[in-house]
Amino acid sequence: RSADAQQHGLWGKRQNPGLWGRSADAQQHGLWGKRQNPGLWGRSAEPGQPGLWGKRQNPGLWGRSAEPLQPGLWGKRQNPGLWGRSADAQQPGLWGKRQDLDIGMWGKRQKAGLWGRSADPGQLGLWGKRRSRIGLWGRSYEPPQFEDLEDLKKKSAIPKPSEQ
């Protein structure tokens, strides 16, 4: 490190972006400063700076923005399909309202046939009203509300050897 923080050494203002060092002054444009290359795994010296952890964080990375409200991986712009959870339950993260139809097994639009459980028993998840119609091994919360109940029983019943 240079003797004076203002000198133009490796740790000074002219530090080559892309190196792994940290500038002597947080306001200098070192790797950890304002010009940090998006995509690196470092953290900017100040949370408000557009470093990897700041506002310009690349969606798809596993980091978390310094502030939950910033559109980092955990923020509002979280890419649907990732396994993260948005910082706010109301944000359209993986677990939120805009959950993708096929990807989210735990959301309201759960695709019938998956093994997940919907967030609300009244929702049409695998464990909900439509389960017995699917013919899976569970029991629906409510009795089957369709007329072909007897036909379903015949199809789901184990055939006796005498009937074969």
From Swiss-Prot:
GO cellular component annotations, sorted alphabetically?
Answer: extracellular region
Name listed for the protein in its UniProt record: LWamide neuropeptides
**Transmembrane stretches, start-end:** none
Q: Which family does it belong to?
A: Belongs to the LWamide neuropeptide family.
Q: Which residues form the propeptide?
A: 1-6, 23-27, 44-49, 65-70, 86-90, 118-123, 140-164
Subcellular location field: Secreted
> List-wise, which residues carry Tryptophan amide?
W11, W20, W32, W41, W53, W62, W74, W83, W95, W106, W115, W127, W137
Q: Which UniProt keywords apply?
A: Amidation, Cleavage on pair of basic residues, Neuropeptide, Repeat, Secreted
Q: What does this protein do?
A: Metamorphosin A may be part of an internal signaling system involved in control of metamorphosis.
Might you name a Gene Ontology BP term for this protein?
Answer: neuropeptide signaling pathway
Q: Which residues form a coiled coil?
A: none
